[in-house]
Amino acid sequence: YNIDRRRIYATGMSTGGGMAAVSACHMADLFAGVAGVSGAYYAPVNRGCQNLPIAFMALHGTNDTLTPYHGTIRRGMRVLPVTDLFRSYERRNGCAGGVDTRPAGYNATRVSARGCRKGVEVIKVHGSNHFWWYSPSAADEMWAFLSRHSK
């Protein structure tokens, strides 16, 4: 197959989103970027990572009861707040500091880190639960973000 090895991405929902984040941590030499929807970001998903920049996006509902936006303890393990993961990718990607915040479709806010080697972005879907979104479209948002990044 004719695969562009500079444009390999990982995506997933729930534990699949967590898997994408683990891939970003330990296989940043392979992936150009990752994105998770309602990701289950169990600690230590962002520890012991390769010291390489990688694009990161999360789409997450603020009322998610399975993998809460602000984190929780589930089955005796800590699920990280989305903001913790965002900050870890800001550091990893050498972001200049500060964020841009703007609407992202109906009842959603896009938060993008400034001045990064690779993009770092979260779409907060206000009042939404553990869900795959169609407004904003999770698939369209992930592709629009990831397709801007290559190795």
Give, region by region, the residue ranges found by the protein language model.
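C-terminal catalytic histidine-bearing segment of alpha/beta-hydrolase fold enzymes
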Residues: A55-L59, L80, E90-K151
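A conserved short beta-strand
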Residues: D29-G39, I54-A55
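Acidic catalytic loop of the alpha/beta-hydrolase fold
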Residues: D64-T67, H130-W132
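Extracellular/periplasmic catalytic domains that process cell-envelope and extracellular macromolecules
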Residues: N2-I3, H26-D29, G48-L52, A113-G119
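Short, flexible/disordered intra-domain loops and linkers
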Residues: Y69-L80
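Active-site loop->helix "elbow" adjoining a glycine-rich segment at hydrolase catalytic centers
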Residues: S14-M19, G39
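Active-site nucleophile loop of the alpha/beta-hydrolase fold
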Residues: A35-A43, G61-D64
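Gly/Ser-rich "nucleophile elbow"/oxyanion-hole loop immediately N-terminal to the catalytic nucleophile
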Residues: Y1-T15, C25-L30
